[in-house]
Amino acid sequence: MLTNREQMIFNWIKEQPSITQKEIAERAGISRSSVSVHISNLTAKGAILGRRYILSERPYFIVIGAANMDIAGRPDTSLVAGDSNPGKVTMSFGGVGRNVAHNLALLDSDVRLLTAFGEDYRARELKEGCLDCGIDIDASITVPGASTSTYLFIMDEHGEMQEAINDMQIYEYVTPERIEERLDVIQHAAACVIDTNLPQQTIEFIAKNVTCPIFCDPVSSIKAQKLKRVLGKIHTLKPNRLEAEMLSGIKITDDDSLKAAAQELLATGLKR
C-alpha cells in the first residue's frame, strides 16, 4: 500500500513521466534526498520500474533465490588427484534463481530478481550480467562486507563433475524480515518463483504470506527437505526423481511408482 506522499508522487509521474526529482521536490516542498527515498519506496513496492519512472502496468514475475558466480575447471587429459592439472578454467553466471530469471527474460517477460549480493567484484559482474539480459534487481539485497555466492567445481576430461565447493552463506541474509520489507512488490507479481537455497524460515514465511501463485525448484534432495511443511502452499513444484522420492516418501522405479509419488505430492494440496 502506498502512503499519501507516495501516491501523490506516483500521480505526478503518471501525468508527467519525464518529471525530474528536482521538480518533484519543488512541487512537494521537500528536499531532493527525500524525493529519492520516496522513489526508492515506489520501486520496491512495484509501482514504478527502476530509475526511468516507467509505470508498472505489464504483469511481471518475481524470482527469489540464488545468483552465483560459477567457476569451472576442466583438465586437458585424465584428472590427477592431488596434483596441478593443465586445463581450462571458465567463469559464468549461475544460481537457480538467476537462471530461471534469465530464461524468463529471454521469453520477453518482465522479471525481477530478489537475491543477495556481496560487496565484491563478483557482485558487480553479476549485477551487470543481470541488467544486461533484462533482469530487474532493484528488489535485491547487497550485504556490506560479504562475499558473493560462488560455486567452484572440478570436472574430469569428459566434463563430469568430480569435486565441488559452494560458498553460499550469504543467502542467510535473505531473512523473513527482508522478504516482509518487499512484500508489496512480491504480492503484485503474476507469480513468485523460489528455490531452496533460501533459509527454511524464509521459505515458510513466503509460503504462508505470499498470495500470488508460488512455483518452486527444490534444487537438491537435501535442500528439498525445507519444503516438507509447506508443500500444500505451493502451486507448482519442479522436482527431479530424487527430490520427488524424498518429498513423497515413495521409491520411484517404474511408471506406477512414479504416478503414486505424484499422487502423494498432490494430496498435500500442491497443484502441479
For each predicted feature, which ranges?
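Conserved phosphate/ATP/ADP-binding segment of small-molecule kinases
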Residues: 211-214, 218-272
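Glycosyltransferases and closely related glycan-assembly transferases
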Residues: 202-214
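Conserved N-terminal subdomain of the carbohydrate kinase-like
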Residues: 57-58, 76-88, 106-190
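Glycine- and other small-residue-rich loops at beta-strand/loop junctions that grip anionic moieties
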Residues: 28, 115, 194-196, 216
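Short gly/ser/thr-rich secondary-structure transition/capping motifs
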Residues: 44-46, 172-177, 216-222
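Structural motif
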Residues: 60-61, 190-191, 236
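Glycine-rich phosphate/adenosyl-contacting loop at the front of the ribokinase-like
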Residues: 4-5, 14, 19-23, 27, ...
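Short beta->alpha connector loops
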Residues: 119-120, 196-200, 218-222
